[in-house]
Amino acid sequence: MKRKLFWICAVAMGMSAFPSFMTQATPATQPLINAEPAVAAQTEQNPQVGQVMPGVQGADAPVVAQNGPSRDVKLTFAQIAPPPGSMVLRGINPNGSIEFGMRSDEVVTKAMLNLEYTPSPSLLPVQSQLKVYLNDELMGVLPVTKEQLGKKTLAQMPINPLFISDFNRVRLEFVGHYQDVCEKPASTTLWLDVGRSSGLDLTYQTLNVKNDLSHFPVPFFDPSDNRTNTLPMVFAGAPDVGLQQASAIVASWFGSRSGWRGQNFPVLYNQLPDRNAIVFATNDKRPDFLRDHPAVKAPVIEMINHPQNPYVKLLVVFGRDDKDLLQAAKGIAQGNILFRGESVVVNEVKPLLPRKPYDAPNWVRTDRPVTFGELKTYEEQLQSSGLEPAAINVSLNLPPDLYLMRSTGIDMDINYRYTMPPVKDSSRMDISLNNQFLQSFNLSSKQEANRLLLRIPVLQGLLDGKTDVSIPALKLGATNQLRFDFEYMNPMPGGSVDNCITFQPVQNHVVIGDDSTIDFSKYYHFIPMPDLRAFANAGFPFSRMADLSQTITVMPKAPNEAQMETLLNTVGFIGAQTGFPAINLTVTDDGSTIQGKDADIMIIGGIPDKLKDDKQIDLLVQATESWVKTPMRQTPFPGIVPDESDRAAETRSTLTSSGAMAAVIGFQSPYNDQRSVIALLADSPRGYEMLNDAVNDSGKRATMFGSVAVIRESGINSLRVGDVYYVGHLPWFERVWYALANHPILLAVLAAISVILLAWVLWRLLRIISRRRLNPDNE
């Protein structure tokens, strides 16, 4: 018996030792220009490259339940690679990468990298190759063959799912050679172009996770998921004002976590959702699928399974009444760090300190200088390495009403370190703001220059040796990108075939110090309104107070699902801009209660009757009828100071149509000249659908400006029309300069008069002094 077992094991070992045909190391690549494929397509007899144990099926796949729900995802380089999506790998910059995530409640069971690339026709076949890494683990190698040179090539590379984690980086490394001896890595013939249609095919399988709030906000929001966070909100029926406020707090908190990903909050009335969702319920008013849930005696937050699908989770916000739901919502927004178990009871949420204007966590502080370390979003953001180091980017989110008109620049103290160039050459650091070049500085080759403090002048053109950097103020907006590019000349030895100089390229390292500072504390807050661009880019004026404590939202009585969705999406968007939930937002369904209030007003659904006849309203949508005022002159870009004559309403047109339309309008509050009204209007369910799509889409929001934004099937059209008013405060002398900014001739006349008056006063003063000196007896 032992001998039989011995021979069976020997045969098995011998068969597993046969080499596998690695057909996909150089995959089926039919060039788009008529050329033969580099390698025949994989057949079922040829196992895949990357197989952990040849001959063992599925050895590189994670062990998961066979009946779990799954989804197939295709991520193209156009979606996940740095802009523009394509990559050009060169001899001195051979690496390119893409990044993707995996949710905590999912696992990848299958992954395939599809590449479309074109190698340089000057490459040496086989010696040149493309290496594929996943999280720095080699997945495979694609040799460049003679048939592929200069032709578009299609290739597939299996990715081992066992190496996929919550955050993943696929790195492509180009190994290029164009001659056997005396190569120069900087040669322009060394390149490989990877097309933006390349991508990853992934199969995700959902896991049946435990109902445990210690992982909250997972699975309702997962930071590893780069998609828009779509989170349905379920109500028993049309919510009253208290429940609207509670749901708005929850939506704004999830918006603050979603950030750049975006957010969407579909609303369901007494319907069972088909995905992870938030459910609001009281003892007396609850959806039918919770009718058997025990009554509660306090605000409770509970995580339960979907009644029909254990892979879907519901977060139930339960209370005895709307007051309990409001307390539970504030518990989610401010006490979630204490969550654990299947449910928690929110005993108390007590405010200790009030919020201050302009203190939104996502905004650069304007009360003191801010260090670059405070602006980092990940650990290694302020450093870079390579023969050509990648650019270092810093995001600056500013209040839209920061008054920078007469500023000569924003002061920055910059401390940076870098690998010294071996010789004095033209290596430099370039500084850009919002893709506009500001200035460059040479990188010195002297030892004492490793730590530099510089100043970028705004008006003069010479270095003055001071320890500041100034940014031209008028180039700043609400969202800004400050970029530092370190450009090295990288001298590389060469030679001839008979006398070749070889060398090992050494990477350059650059660092912007965390202690570098930028100072916005010297500037006033002042802005001409209405300005829908400020609302679309930063949620202003509501976001002036991050907790929306000076905002009143006017809702229709018994709002429908679309109107509730507009409320939740809007406060979610504002939360994404500020990074803080709207815990002190006021919601009302009675338009008469806003009279005399010192607050900014957000209107959803329809203009209250008392405001419909306001002369400052420039558009109104009511059922199938709508009217709009158009300006004397519409300019594509706003001036530094708004021209009120151009904005004056020339005509008013009234139309009736059955087609869907929505609009966002802004005007001055009739109850306080320092307050604003923003109204989000629609004429039909389809109109609200377009309105919500515009609020959630950053690209569409970018087209909003002026006082009116009309949303139709064709897109968004904006107008600057109607009266201009000003929000904020300027000293009297700044107001004079601001008022004269659009009138240079008047400014010159006033300047001349001022000079004449000053000269006359000085002349009179000198006459008096001279008279007293010559006639002391007259004193």
Swiss-Prot record:
Disulfide pattern: none
Domain of life where this protein originates: Bacteria
Signal peptide stretch: 1-25
Biological process annotations from GO: cellulose biosynthetic process; UDP-alpha-D-glucose metabolic process
Pathway info: Glycan metabolism; bacterial cellulose biosynthesis
One GO term describing the cellular component: plasma membrane
Miscellaneous: The genes bscA, bcsB, bcsZ and bcsC are constitutively transcribed but cellulose synthesis occurs only when DgcC, a putative transmembrane protein regulated by CsgD, is expressed. Cellulose production is abolished in E.coli K12.
Family to which the UniProt record says this protein belongs: Belongs to the AcsB/BcsB family.
Name used for this protein in its record: Cyclic di-GMP-binding protein
Gene: bcsB
